[in-house]
Amino acid sequence: MMYDNEEELYEEENAEEISHELWQEACWIVINAYFDEKGLVRQQLDSFDEFIQMSVQRIVEDSPAIELQAEAQHTSGEVETPPRFSLKFEQIYLSKPTHWEKDGSPSPMMPNEARLRNLTYSAPLYVDITKTKNVEGLDPVETQHQKTFIGKIPIMLRSTYCLLSQLTDRDLTELNECPLDPGGYFIINGSEKVLIAQEKMATNTVYVFSMKDGKYAFKTEIRSCLEHSSRPTSTLWVNMMARGSQNIKKSAIGQRIIAILPYIKQEIPIMIVFRALGFVADRDILEHIIYDFDDPEMMEMVKPSLDEAFVVQEQNVALNFIGARGARPGVTKDKRIKYAKEILQKEMLPHVGVSDFCETKKAYFLGYMVHRLLLASLGRRELDDRDHYGNKRLDLAGPLLAFLFRGLFKNLMKEVRMYTQKFIDRGKDFNLELAIKTNIITDGLRYSLATGNWGDQKKAHQARAGVSQVLNRLTFASTLSHLRRVNSPIGRDGKLAKPRQLHNTLWGMLCPAETPEGAAVGLVKNLALMAYISVGSQPSPILEFLEEWSMENLEEIAPSAIADATKIFVNGCWVGIHRDPEQLMATLRKLRRQMDIIVSEVSMIRDIRDREIRIYTDAGRICRPLLIVENGSLLLKKTHVEMLKERDYNNYSWQVLVASGVVEYIDTLEEETVMIAMSPYDLKQDKDYAYCTTYTHCEIHPAMILGVCASIIPFPDHNQSPRNTYQSAMGKQAMGVYITNFHVRMDTLAHVLYYPMKPLVTTRSMEYLRFRELPAGINSIVAILCYTGYNQEDSVILNASAVERGFFRSVFYRSYKDSENKRVGDQEENFEKPHRGTCQGMRNAHYDKLDDDGIIAPGIRVSGDDVVIGKTITLPENDDELDSNTKRFSKRDASTFLRNSETGIVDQVMLTLNSEGYKFCKIRVRSVRIPQIGDKFASRHGQKGTCGIQYRQEDMAFTCEGLAPDIIINPHAIPSRMTIGHLIECLQGKLGSNKGEIGDATPFNDAVNVQKISTFLQEYGYHLRGNEVMYNGHTGRKINAQVFLGPTYYQRLKHMVDDKIHSRARGPVQILVRQPMEGRARDGGLRFGEMERDCQISHGAAQFLRERLFEVSDPYRVHICNFCGLIAIANLRNNTFECKGCKNKTQISQVRLPYAAKLLFQELMSMNIAPRLMVT
């Protein structure tokens, strides 16, 4: 399209702009496109795909070839060199998830089959091996072993290699899978496991911290780690000593600077390290540290360090100095120098390079670290913040599994080497298939995923615990939230408040509301809705590009040039300097927006004040999409939005938006160098009133800073902040439909609400959480009213008639499982109906409900301690004539009983074979849970309450329309908690039910306010603030107050009285102390603790105290010798007593004391301490 003059062009552009009114819809179209393409667990899937497609191959290729040679045999004088073998592992292949039955027949494994049969959903891994045989004087012989099986890798559901990845909703339904299930978890032994993202400090980054009080005033540290390498991180510290013991002034000039190198026990003066790298002259060293010699302050700071290292002036002397302080003392000087060289080359700053000839680069980097230290101590650059989220990386499934696989593959290679070496030493050839122990990888991965101990099974105490967790399936929202969880591996008992606090840099990356209460507060976090975690990309294209774009290499420049130029870092490694940083940044940004050379997840930061450009391409950076603003207007135009609206037909998608440079991903560090407008309205403000005119980006919608659980809350911006946190925790316990295929699943526990409703008042974000399709609550008519006093202290009154009609009724499923395992020896297990005549150890329970095959039939009502699975174990035949009385039993009972506190109906029975090929059975029992007094309910604003009483409709208060509320809550619940969102939701719901449309309660939305809602309500003839006149249900008289009433969305939580009720009169006791057991499951007693004891003492209730702590707990009697006070021998049958020590047979008293006290006395006696009881 050609324009005659510029004005037309300008008008055309203006027409393209999105107006403020249209923006309310436009931004949600963009967000829709994002979630359509990405879903909510993309970060898990992408990370796993990266592991399968890249990391596994890289690990296999990086492992060195196995070189084998037999010991030379000196037999007949002449020595012949035995043949040499080498094994190289090459290309890997991953098949589709497969299951091999016991008879060896393979079949594709479907996830639901894996869940039901307790299998592991994993795919076989194959590798090509090249075997080379070198015999002296002959050509090497190469043999290829194609596709050798080396183990199975668990597959993440819905990832590229999963069987479900490309299926349509219909196909999924036919496979008994829920189309709404997001995937992102593994199935290990039939249970669903999710890998929690682990937070860690970023490697290869220089940090400067000031030390409060210690021998150092400042500390610079860098934890170097080669990208994708098995070597553990090696840390280098460059520290500035504190002056004396008196308190350190921060402006203290001239302290010694020392380095702490890996594997070197003592501190090494920094100048000696430089000399060991081959920079001997003072001037050379200083050039690498202080780039500008006209800086007297800095020169002054390094003086003491120069003086300290004055004695060492040659490289070898310096190397010897370092080597002497190394691990092995008492070796020759050459050895020491070699050792020091090795450490400087391999262990110090390995990310700069571990090959030869990296000395210049290392010297520059070390100089840079000292430079940073000096800047910090002079107060010219602020210190680093440990809790800044830019300094953090998240390890997802990919890096975690790669770490595990690397170790296991190493073990596998070790085993192969040992096995083959044995054969070669005997002069035989070996079979590769037998040399490879496939279960090393299979079992290693399965063990870590099953237990959550991340690391080697043999060193379980070193491993991180709780990395893999069982996926929470209580509600759909709790599942989604669990898949997006982030964990900081800081000890939960630490009293440090800093890591737990909400840091500014978390904006838009992690949810500000969703964190647990108690010990883990602030350490367990959740991703915000649009946050994404980078999977990492290769830095090589960027390095090549920089070479072309006039970046000067460190080896080629004069050190004096650095002072004026800008340093360039790629992934923390200093690669060079550049004279025109602004131009370079513009070019880099342009390339990233066109997705040319540079991937969209790469971040680039230009620190203008410190003259640095930092580029990061590594994995685990958390980033989020923002709209790009240029010259004060959005690059997103109406045409883009129109195209997105039609994206089902025209192949337009989120990815196209990113590729066309309208949206870009910004990570936490880069976010600090850009200027973000909250909405396009900010861009359009008058120049005179505007807060800023140089915006570079714009938020898509501020509601996207919230996470999964907080996005369900209506009007969260009108609630006090801890209330949102409480609801985020409670939303995970609400009952609803947790997944659509629950009828074919055999979950251990499941709660399903009878009539879930979608809320009348929703947020726009809910669509992506599928809360409309899988809701967890009911729109109930709620009155806020003091009525009969049965709703004091956060209890609620329910309408009994509504409950009879099915209000908040739910069904509870519990599964029981058992299998016929083969025992050691000739004991075998069988499912059958045990008979009292032949079976030992049968309980007095109902065995007659079982069928003849030993398994209960569906539809039978069962109650506590009924048998659901009958199983017997054959006893070994005993040949002794003595035990003639036990002879009649040939079997022992090993049945499964229903939990003693539950009742229900057998819902479904499944019989199949497990992975070992044994008979395997799962039984699901259902019970109906009707709301009753003591059950817990909550609104979506952290307003939880238990049911205090239920009144029939006739006894409830009612309005003039005859409307009786379902729930009455107490007005005292509102003022101190300031949950205004609760009230606005009620008002909005009242309007919505009259208007016949769903209310919008998205946070940070200017379009909705109380004023508008009130005006509309008035049009429908209601009181503008939602109050009603009500009448007392008992007397029929008008209540002397206006009552706030309307529909509010309430949730039923999983805490029910039936699962909690517990009492005990008599029951089992512990064997050791003979005191009652603990806990409801074991029918235990209630503990009368120390504090209760103290109260009774202060009351002086001595007899009651004796009864509680002695008579109803563990009474016991012993006989005590009156002379020595020790326990005597008593034979009550013959009435003979004697104390062996005193030869006393008459002076003996009976003493009653707690059994625990008797045990303590005897344990003391075993330690040679005699507690003597003085009896009179």
UniProtKB/Swiss-Prot annotation:
GO terms for biological process: transcription by RNA polymerase II. CDD domains: RNA_pol_B_RPB2. GO terms for cellular component: mitochondrion; RNA polymerase II, core complex. Gene3D superfamilies: 2.40.50.150, 3.90.1070.20, DNA-directed RNA polymerase, subunit 2, domain 6, RNA polymerase alpha subunit dimerisation domain, RNA polymerase Rpb2, domain 2. A zinc finger (C4-type) spans 1121-1142. It is an enzyme of class 2 (transferase). InterPro entries: DNA-dir_RNA_pol_su2 (IPR015712), DNA-dir_RNAP_su2_dom (IPR007120), DNA-dir_RNAP_su2_hyb_sf (IPR037033), RNA_pol_bsu_CS (IPR007121), RNA_pol_bsu_protrusion (IPR007644), RNA_pol_Rpb2_2 (IPR007642), RNA_pol_Rpb2_2_sf (IPR037034), RNA_pol_Rpb2_3 (IPR007645). PROSITE patterns: RNA_POL_BETA. GO terms for molecular function: DNA binding; DNA-directed RNA polymerase activity; ribonucleoside binding; zinc ion binding. It catalyses: RNA(n) + a ribonucleoside 5'-triphosphate = RNA(n+1) + diphosphate. Zn(2+) binds at residues 1121, 1124, 1139, 1142. Disulfide bonds: none annotated. Its EC number is 2.7.7.6. It is found in: Nucleus. Mg(2+) binds at residue 794. Keywords: DNA-directed RNA polymerase, Magnesium, Metal-binding, Nucleotidyltransferase, Nucleus, Transcription, Transferase, Zinc, Zinc-finger. The binding of ribonucleoside triphosphate to the RNA polymerase II transcribing complex probably involves a two-step mechanism. The initial binding seems to occur at the entry (E) site and involves a magnesium ion coordinated by three conserved aspartate residues of the two largest RNA Pol II subunits. Component of the RNA polymerase II (Pol II) complex consisting of 12 subunits. NCBIfam families: PRK09606.1. DNA-dependent RNA polymerase catalyzes the transcription of DNA into RNA using the four ribonucleoside triphosphates as substrates. Second largest component of RNA polymerase II which synthesizes mRNA precursors and many functional non-coding RNAs. Proposed to contribute to the polymerase catalytic activity and forms the polymerase active center together with the largest subunit. Pol II is the central component of the basal RNA polymerase II transcription machinery. It is composed of mobile elements that move relative to each other. This is DNA-directed RNA polymerase II subunit RPB2. It comes from Drosophila melanogaster (Fruit fly). The gene is Polr2B.
